[in-house]
């Protein structure tokens, strides 16, 4: 009986230690969500304005930029998968990788070879464990992405896309680089504290649309030196903005998923501690009852012996 009580107390102590860790992680994630949401909101005006400027440029310039032109028979598709660097965030990474696998299968059905790029150690480990090629990976900033990181990723993707313009099947063409004909991104959209959704979107060839108040007046722009030159200079930045927005949404989603997972773990630890405490109290009561019974039995035996 004593050994059972000691084991229960040991388990209560272990559950309490785990609860402290999960509660701390929950509080940290909660504080990061607000900051991540603020960064998402702060980045939107720039994304909106660069989209509007590009739309105005597109109206004024000939739409023949390589990033806008559909290729007749696309053979290779670049897929950027945004995951987390750390775990303990529930089904966050599993959902992203599930959508990525669905896109992978769809591209295969369409006769396209997926070329994988990843952000975050979890996606990198996933593909490395399965011996599947990752063309390039970026890690270490999933919880707090910076624009410089998004720019570096976008530069790599744009370079691969432009290199694919002269490819013929597996022939890399004149530049000697085997590029891609499409670019897709898989990440998690942050909708609310309770809702995040993994999505896959094509980002090249791009379709530029006006973003703003539908009923409001559009801004008139004057372009120097000319619309075509500015269009070519801004389009890669637009792609970097799309990547950065996805990274920010993913960071907010990661923190929200981690908070939800850690809260569930903390609640489970509470329930476990309550159950083990009741069990330990019951065992202790049984032990006391047994000891009292043994004492009473001993007293009665002594009394009987004295009576004789």
Swiss-Prot record:
Annotated Pfam families: ATP-synt
Protein name per Swiss-Prot or TrEMBL: ATP synthase gamma chain
Any one GO molecular-function label of the UniProt entry: ATP binding
Task of the protein: Produces ATP from ADP in the presence of a proton gradient across the membrane. The gamma chain is believed to be important in regulating ATPase activity and the flow of protons through the CF(0) complex.
SUPFAM superfamilies, per the entry: ATP synthase (F1-ATPase), gamma subunit
Record-level GO cellular component terms: plasma membrane; proton-transporting ATP synthase complex
Native source organism of the sequence: Mycobacteroides abscessus (strain ATCC 19977 / DSM 44196 / CCUG 20993 / CIP 104536 / JCM 13569 / NCTC 13031 / TMC 1543 / L948) (Mycobacterium abscessus)
Topology class, membrane: Peripheral membrane protein
Annotated disulfide bonds: none
Keyword line: ATP synthesis, Cell membrane, CF(1), Hydrogen ion transport, Ion transport, Membrane, Transport
Subunit field text: F-type ATPases have 2 components, CF(1) - the catalytic core - and CF(0) - the membrane proton channel. CF(1) has five subunits: alpha(3), beta(3), gamma(1), delta(1), epsilon(1). CF(0) has three main subunits: a, b and c.
Location in or out of the cell: Cell membrane
Source species, domain of life: Bacteria
Family, per entry: Belongs to the ATPase gamma chain family.
One annotated GO biological process: proton motive force-driven plasma membrane ATP synthesis
């Amino acid at each position: 009986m004593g050994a059972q009580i000691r084991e229960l107390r040991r388990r209560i102590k272990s559950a309490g230690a785990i609860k402290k860790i999960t509660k701390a992680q929950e509080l940290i994630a909660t504080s990061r969500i607000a900051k991540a949401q603020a960064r998402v909101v702060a980045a939107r005006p720039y994304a909106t304005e660069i989209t509007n400027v590009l739309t105005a440029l597109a109206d004024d310039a000939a739409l023949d930029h390589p990033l806008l032109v559909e290729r007749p028979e696309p053979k290779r598709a670049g897929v950027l998968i945004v995951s987390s660097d750390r775990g303990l965030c529930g089904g966050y990474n599993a959902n992203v990788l599930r959508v990525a696998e669905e896109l992978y299968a769809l591209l295969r059905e369409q006769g396209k070879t997926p070329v994988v790029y990843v952000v975050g150690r979890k996606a990198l480990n996933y593909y490395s464990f399965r011996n599947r090629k990752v063309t390039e990976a970026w890690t270490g900033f999933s919880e707090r992405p910076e624009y410089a990181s998004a720019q570096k990723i976008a530069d790599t993707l744009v370079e691969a896309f432009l290199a694919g313009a002269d490819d013929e099947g597996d022939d890399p063409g004149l530049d000697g680089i085997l590029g891609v004909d499409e670019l897709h991104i898989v990440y998690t959209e942050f909708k609310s504290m309770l809702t995040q959704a993994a999505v896959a979107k094509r980002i090249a060839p791009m379709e530029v649309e006006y973003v703003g108040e539908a009923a409001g007046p559009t801004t008139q722009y004057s372009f120097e030196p000319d619309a075509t030159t500015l269009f070519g200079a801004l389009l890669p930045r637009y792609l970097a903005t799309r990547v950065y927005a996805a990274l920010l949404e993913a960071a907010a989603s990661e923190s929200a998923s981690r908070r939800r997972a850690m809260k569930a773990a903390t609640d489970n630890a509470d329930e476990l501690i309550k159950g083990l405490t009741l069990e330990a109290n019951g065992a202790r009561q049984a032990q006391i009852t047994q000891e009292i019974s043994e004492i009473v039995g001993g007293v009665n035996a002594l009394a009987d012996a004295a009576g004789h």
